[in-house]
Swiss-Prot record:
InterPro entries (UniProt xref): C-type_lectin-like (IPR001304), C-type_lectin-like/link_sf (IPR016186), CTDL_fold (IPR016187), Ly49_N (IPR013600), Mouse_KLRs (IPR052013), NKR-like_CTLD (IPR033992)
Gene Ontology, cellular component aspect: cell surface; plasma membrane
UniProt GO MF annotations: carbohydrate binding
Residues carrying sugar: 87, 104
Keywords associated with the record: Cell adhesion, Cell membrane, Disulfide bond, Glycoprotein, Lectin, Membrane, Receptor, Signal-anchor, Transmembrane, Transmembrane helix
Subcellular location: Cell membrane
Membrane topology, record value: Single-pass type II membrane protein
Full protein name: Killer cell lectin-like receptor 8
Disulfide feature: 149-154, 167-255, 171-257, 236-249
Residues in the Cytoplasmic compartment per record: 1-44
Role according to the record: Receptor on natural killer (NK) cells for class I MHC.
Amino acid sequence: MSEQEVTFPTMRFHKSSGLNSQVRLEGTQRSRKAGLRVCSVPWQLIVIALGILCSLRLVIVAVFVTKFFQYSQHKQEINETLNHRHNCSNMQRDFNLKEEMLTNKSIDCRPSYELLEYIKREQERWDSETKSVSDSSRDTGRGVKYWFCYGTKCYYFIMNKTTWSGCKANCQHYSVPIVKIEDEDELKFLQRHVILESYWIGLSYDKKKKEWAWIHNGQSKLDMKIKKMNFTSRGCVFLSKARIEDTDCNTPYYCICGKKLDKFPD
C-alpha cells in the first residue's frame, strides 16, 4: 500500500508536467503569431511610404521634364525672334545702302542724262535740217532722189538700181566715192534714214588679198565686226534698214555715195 501511494502521486506529477508543456507550447505559438502580426504592420507602412516617394519622384521628374521642354521651346522662340530681328536689321541696312547707292547713282547719272538730252536735241536739229535739205534737192538725170549732210559728211542717195560697179561709177560722176562707213554710229544713222530697200556701200571682197576691203583701201572701226559676220565672199556688201550683208556684185541695188565736204556741191 505504501508502493501504490508513492506511484500515484508520481503519475499525477507526470500528467501535470504534460499539461504544463502543452500550455507552454500553445502560449509560445500564440506569442509568435502575435509577433508576426506586430511585425507585418511596419512593412506595410514602409511599402506604402516607398510607393508615395516613388510617385513623388515621378511627379517631380515629369514636372522637371515639362519645364525643361518649355524652357527649350522658349529659348528657341527667343533665338528665332533675335534672328528675325537680326535679319530685319540686315535687310534694313541693305535697303538703306541700296537706297543710298541709287541716290548717288541718280546724282552721277544726272550729267549723263543732260548729255543724252543734248544729243537728242542735236539729233532732232540735224533731222530737221536734213529734211529741209532733202526737200531742196534736185534730180540731175542720174536718179539722185535726195542728199543730205550730217556733221561734216554728206550723203547722196542714187535711186536707180544698178550693179556695184555701176554704183561706183555713178558716185564718181558726182566726184564723191561710194560711201565708206566709219563706225557703228554712222551705220545705225544710215539704217535709220534709208527706206525699205537695199543699197550698195563701198565694201567689197579683194580677191588678190583674200579679204574684205573698203573703197580706196580705207580703214573703218567696223572692220572687226565685219570679220565676225563671216561673209561668204560673194563679192560686194549692201546695206538695208535691218542689216549689212554680202551678195553677188551684179545684183541691182540702189546706191549711197558719201564724203566729207566743206560745202554742198553745185
